[in-house]
């Protein structure tokens, strides 16, 4: 966690120094954690709600088109749910660094496509009544992707995003079954942006 925070602090000035519109963006995240009622299938749907705080710099490149850079820190809960599952809650921390393209250089509607890399950490463990135990752990280096739409007015912006969370490595072992694979969840977030250096 300390390493992720250090990366965030070192790279944030790059995002803030780039672009005509520099924003601080706070994004409450909604992730649905699913019950795992089928004990013969791998556990999935473990990424829950959280928050993302990011710094973004955007600049107009042609009429209404924009390009930009972003840097953030994201937290999500991790939990394995189920009728016969004993679990511990865990946390997923990640630091996404991303490039943005989209539309919206002035007040009005904007669109945003983000893609880049994400450094992640976190895990959750569980046991079940069949004598099995498992662990889900974040992959340390991942791709990052998001798509969003919203509206901006002077200092402020508001929108909604779909985000692919960092890939997770899943391991499980019981007297009758064993599996080891990787998967990704997706989450939805609102985003509230503030431009501290806005000038009329």
Regions found by a protein language model. Name each.
Residues 35-37, 74-81, 135-200:
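Predominantly the C-terminal beta-signal and adjacent terminal strand-loop region
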Residues 17-73, 79-81, 187, 191-200:
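Short glycine/proline- and aromatic-enriched beta-strand/turn motifs that initiate or cap beta-hairpins
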Residues 20-22, 44-53, 67, 87-97, ...:
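Residues that define the transmembrane beta-barrel architecture of outer-membrane proteins
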Residues 63-67, 107-111, 154-159, 198-200:
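Repeated loop/turn-to-beta-strand initiation elements of outer-membrane beta-barrel proteins
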Residues 108-134:
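Membrane-proximal helix-loop-helix units in multi-pass membrane proteins
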Residues 28-34, 57-59, 73-79, 93, ...:
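Transmembrane beta-strands of outer-membrane beta-barrel pores
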Residues 22-28, 69-71, 97, 111-115, ...:
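Membrane-embedded beta-strand positions of outer-membrane beta-barrel proteins
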Residues 4-13:
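Sec-dependent N-terminal signal peptides
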């Amino acid at each position: 966690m300390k390493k992720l925070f250090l990366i965030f602090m070192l790279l944030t000035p790059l995002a803030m120094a780039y672009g005509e519109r520099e924003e601080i963006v706070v994004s409450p995240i909604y992730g649905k954690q699913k019950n795992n009622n089928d004990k013969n299938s791998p556990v999935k749907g473990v990424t829950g709600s959280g928050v993302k705080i990011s710094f973004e710099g955007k600049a107009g490149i042609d009429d209404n088109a924009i390009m930009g850079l972003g840097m953030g820190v994201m937290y999500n809960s991790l939990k394995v749910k189920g009728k016969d599952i004993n679990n511990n809650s865990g946390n997923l921390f990640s630091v996404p660094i991303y490039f943005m393209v989209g539309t919206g250089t002035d007040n009005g509607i904007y669109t945003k496509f983000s893609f880049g890399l994400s450094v992640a950490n976190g895990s959750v463990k569980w046991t079940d009544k069949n004598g099995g135990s498992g662990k889900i752990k974040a992959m340390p280096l991942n791709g990052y992707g998001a798509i969003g739409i919203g509206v901006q007015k002077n200092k402020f912006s508001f929108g909604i995003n779909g985000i692919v969370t960092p890939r997770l490595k899943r391991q499980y072992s019981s007297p009758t079954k064993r599996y080891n694979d990787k998967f990704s969840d997706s989450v939805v977030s609102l985003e509230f942006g503030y431009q501290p250096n806005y000038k009329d």
